[in-house]
């Protein structure tokens, strides 16, 4: 198997095993109960394009959460956030995410794959599985493609069946980042290619990702430990307060 095919096969396994069930309601509490690292993002409301991020960790699943630092600013989708697939029944309030809506997904999602321009050898501080972005690395957002919501090396596929994709190596804000395990068993049209990545500044916004300062992102990538089952918890501030006890959030 050549390098491109190996990359594609590995990515398919990783992204397909992130735990998000298409067409199935996700039970966030068991995920949170097992986790020892949380990246918590809250926004003032559903249409807010800015918010805050704070890191929490604990020694064991039975230990109390402790904050690692003070909140830092983030930007989200150009039209705010919306309930991601698997979380449609959590609340009667709030929109539901769809492809191209410019909204970042709300819910609880695994964080277990890093990416960047640099080769793996120069990213040794990153403990997550890591993908070096090549000129041929695409994230497919074409809902008609068999590769929808998948990061692939287009040079390794027998037939490129998509007409729309992010050419990731061409995006400067993807110099470093983390794949969010959203819509991993893809529900067509419910959103794709969701990442944590470098922002263009505090007044910017994204197409549906969560972005922030590069130095903080590099710190986060070195902090994330796959053995601690890290999660992204992304909610409006009101929903975080409402769900805090039920989901056993910090």
Language-model segments: residues:
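Cell wall/extracellular polymer interaction/catalysis modules
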Residues: 23-207, 216-250
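Conserved "landmark" site that anchors the functional core of diverse proteins
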Residues: 213
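Bacterial N-terminal signal peptides that target proteins for export
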Residues: 1-11
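Residues that recognize and position ribonucleotide moieties
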Residues: 210
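Hydrophobic h-region of N-terminal signal peptides that target proteins for export
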Residues: 11-22
């Amino acid at each position: 198997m050549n390098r491109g095919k190996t990359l594609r096969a590995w990515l398919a396994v990783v992204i397909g095993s992130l735990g998000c069930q298409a067409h199935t309601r996700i039970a966030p509490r068991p995920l949170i109960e097992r986790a020892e690292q949380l990246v918590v993002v809250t926004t003032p409301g559903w249409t807010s394009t800015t918010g805050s991020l704070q890191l929490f960790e604990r020694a064991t699943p039975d230990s109390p959460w402790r904050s690692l630092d003070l909140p830092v600013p983030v930007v989200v989708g150009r039209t705010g956030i919306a309930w991601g697939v698997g979380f449609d029944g959590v609340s009667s309030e709030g929109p539901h995410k769809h492809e191209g809506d410019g909204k970042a997904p709300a819910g609880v999602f695994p964080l277990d794959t890093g990416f960047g321009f640099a080769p793996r050898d120069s990213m040794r501080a990153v403990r997550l599985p890591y993908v070096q972005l090549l000129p041929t690395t695409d994230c497919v957002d074409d809902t008609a493609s068999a590769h929808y919501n998948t990061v692939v090396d287009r040079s390794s596929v027998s037939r490129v069946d998509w007409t729309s994709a992010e050419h990731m190596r061409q995006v400067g804000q993807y110099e470093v980042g983390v794949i969010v395990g959203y819509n991993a068993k893809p529900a067509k049209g419910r959103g794709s290619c969701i990442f944590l990545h470098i922002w263009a500044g505090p007044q910017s916004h994204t197409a549906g990702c969560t972005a922030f300062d590069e130095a903080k992102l590099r710190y986060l990538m070195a902090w994330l430990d796959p053995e601690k089952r890290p999660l992204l918890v992304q909610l409006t501030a009101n929903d975080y307060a409402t769900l805090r006890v039920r989901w056993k959030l910090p």
